[in-house]
Amino acid sequence: MKLFAAFRLDPLNQCLWRRGDTGLEARILLAPKTFAVLAYLVEHAGRLVTHEELLEAVWPDTVVEPQAVKRYVVAVRSALGDRPKNPIFIETMPKRGYRFIAPVSAPDRKSVV
């Protein structure tokens, strides 16, 4: 389980949840590869993740056009309400890759209900 801003990422169940103003959580539906891109970036928060690294991690042993990474990052940003020009979650590193810049925490398993 990973927490960042108003979001809770549950890799085990492949779910993304957003906490609203009332404290209630709403599930955000993501396609499997979109979830995989988000999960990889969150898992490696704070460091540069290259395009090649994302391709190898999310599409192992598969030939995928390089633009696929960009399309899925756009989908992740849309789900998070992030903007590339003024990012709070995903920073684009031109010609290199992406960096997840929001603080991420992993709560104690016993404290998660």
Predicted segments with their positions:
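Cytosolic linker/terminal segments flanking nucleotidyl-cyclase catalytic modules
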Residues: 1-113
